[in-house]
Amino acid sequence: MSSQDLEQFRIFNKKLETEKDIKPILNAIKSLFDYKPAAEAKITLSNVGISNIVRCLNVQDKSNDDLTCEVLKICFEKFGVGDVVKHFTSHIMYLLRHEKNCVRRLAVDEVYKSVIADVSLLPVPEYIDIFVAVAQMVCDKDVGVANKAIIITSNLQFEAYPKVLEEMKIALEHNSSSKCNAYEVVINISLKSYELFKLSVDNGYIEHMVEELKSNDVLYQLNILELLSRLSVKPYGINYLVKDGALERITALIGDLRNNPLGGLLLPGYIKFFASIAHYYPKEIFEKYPIFLNSLFNAIESGEQTVLPVALDALGFIGITIEGKLCLTAVGSPFIQAIEKIGQLIRNSPAEIKIRALYCYASLISVEKDTPSQGPVDHRVTLMTREWFRSLNKESDAMETLLGICKIPFPDIKLAAYSLLDAVCQHLWGEELVARVAGFVEFLLDRSINEPKEAKEAKYDIIKRLSQSSVFDDNILTRFKTYVKEGPFYSDTTLQVAMEEGN
């Protein structure tokens, strides 16, 4: 800024100390800096400071608070990431604790930008007070401020966390929403390393979370289960829950749901919790906590709409791994009955359930995600998945049934059906079924069908897979390979335009 602008800002700054009507002065400062180059404005603001602007927030008349925030925001925008906190540390501390929402939001945004850009911009020894102040804001009544505080306190350097975790205890004295915010920070920190998890345990947070599952607040319980499920996928997390007896206590709570008038609302959360663990440790969960499997299969068999979508997702998540498939088949008839029920749901349910059931089936049939590249598929899995697929329609031909579903014009159903078809075509027996069913190859190769982009890409991937198959004759393989070469979005119009452009 020119020396004239610098002097002008000094005059405005001085007037803020003496004038009673500060609104015109704040507007003048706003106009002065609004369009000034950042480099020039930064020098002036660094030299003169912002103390008098900040002081405008500390007067009895609060009518100018919003305008003061606007002015401070313009001033802060002239600085690089992290520089505002470095240049005006004491002011940021004051702003973080201000009673006005817009003021706290302004301050926490500056800390947020610094931490997200580069956590090392604010070294812990110098700025620990800032981090402590932000940690206390996870209880903030302004949801936006609280959410930013959660992100900041979850992404600091290691040496900040002992103090941050200590501060989270403040939230435990507040309402369930604030406690959930604190728990989220605790879990985010615990997932970073065993040492930090141990620190969370020593502070009593994990035990407190498990005990809070006895609350009558349904949403609160579900949030805790969601957070604990994230922790349980870590070996040290699940080991603690088992050794501490927490998993046993959570299992007992499932048994009590039938006597709880709100049990129907809670059951989906408990199923998701145990499914997240069973995805990684199916054998141990099936053996030690059979009540989970019983609840899962009962939920599928009952067809209860409040829990069925979650149950389908859970079964698919468990069965997507090879170990999960083998453990499920070892369960015997309850699982077979569940498979048959899912086949019925695919054939006869409304769109939402049909789609969830198709994706569940696809996860159970698929082997690609859990099989080494080009490696052989366990022959037991080949036999199991073939039998499971037949349950799609035992009274008719399962592959003809799938072809019919693939032809349904609704995009979401079609995409889910293609997901199942792709899973089926990961097996030799699946390729053979495609080759056997009249009209299936023609349907796949028909580019005249009006399909959304995602469906065209999904069908293209299936054809690309089948183009490497050994079960089709040379003519069909040639057509498959031509389709692959032309790409998923080729059409006669594309060819016509290309020819016209070449003339």
Please report, for each region that a protein language model flagged, where it lies by residue.
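N-terminal "cap/leader" segments of large eukaryotic alpha-helical scaffolds
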Residues: M1-N58, L165, S491-N503
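Alpha-solenoid helical repeat scaffolds
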Residues: E70-V71, F79-V81, D109-E110, I152-T153, ...
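Residue-level detector of extended alpha-helical repeat arrays and alpha-solenoid scaffolds
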Residues: I22-I25, D65, R104-R105, A146, ...
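Eukaryotic tandem repeat interaction scaffolds
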Residues: A246, A252-I413
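HEAT/HEAT-like alpha-solenoid repeats
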Residues: R10-T18, I50-N58, K62, T89-R97, ...
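Solenoidal tandem-repeat scaffolds enriched in leucines and small polar residues
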Residues: N101, V111-N294, E304, A311, ...
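Hydrophobic residues within the alpha-helices of tandem HEAT/HEAT-like
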Residues: I29-K36, T68-E77, E110-D118, I152-F158, ...
